[in-house]
Amino acid sequence: MSTHFQTAVKKRVSHTHRRDAIDRLIERGERTNLALLVRTSGLDGEFRRYALNGLAECNGREQLEELADNTTIEPSLRRRADDLR
């Protein structure tokens, strides 16, 4: 796991630092880690959606397809993944 991923999932991280960490994942094209953030149920929905949108930015079509079909994540996230792919 990258340092940026670890920052994104830590419990006591400021909103700004968490968003910055997700931005770094997007910039580096870390699609697997972004998809994992979307699946992380302990993470606020705002950040899960941000990671989902980041997948679209870094051409994560394969991950978006997988997330759209994944029944273990919230239906709203699945619908958004389907829209983005």
Region roles according to the model:
Residues 7, 16-28, 36-39, 46-60, ...:
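Structural detector for internal amphipathic alpha-helices that build alpha-solenoid repeat scaffolds
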